[in-house]
């Protein structure tokens, strides 16, 4: 059970390891882009290439989904970023239970956007957890964790790709221990849990009075959506990448065109250089190229 790119790696590993995948559950097709054409989830796209049966129930709490699962009679249910809550009747169904590939070191960052929030909060270390699923959100006993450093310039999209592969490997190593009864169960420390809520556009506006590192984390943590954003000469632009600039005495938000892009003063007397941006209605491009076509008129 999974939906986005993160889940594809785990499904692919199940297939490569020779497990019989009796069914793939993913979110319903959704309209996308200007044409509002129905688009398959990445998991569905991969499943169809492997001739795997795909199911897309609107709800998991109705009799239809439970009926399908009872007919499939899975020994194990693997969940990776499915996006739907499983009722207790489904959690109790498989012989070996339901396990989840979660992209954080639990109990930190339970919730929908753990990768983004780890970067937004300036974490240096993150990882993946394989856990037993319970009715409470991401609160089940942990079977296995794998930690990794977050790269200094790694954004959420790149980290998602890397953690998806780490999660798939951890899943591959976990399943045999479920079958032979050697899987460990480590209860989570409820006093140490943190929450990673869904992202929304309210997180986008850059407050240049914050430190350069905090803003850099905001930029990297909001890739590919909703993206950090700022105003350049009154025009809204999405910010995709930055570099550390020089110390500055300018007021926060003061902007200067420089060779590598657009230098902006931050609240800690440091500057960040915006190197990649996207103007409203335009394409992502180098900030230096944008400034050649739209010379900076004002500072701040």
Language model features with spans:
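N-terminal Rossmann-like dinucleotide-binding module
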Residues: 1-35
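N-terminal glycine-/serine-/threonine-rich beta1-alpha1-beta2 phosphate-ribose binding loop
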Residues: 31-73
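Conserved beta-strand segments of alpha/beta enzyme cores
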Residues: 20, 51-53, 97
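An anion-binding loop in the catalytic cleft
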Residues: 209-300
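A structural microfeature
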Residues: 23, 56, 143-144
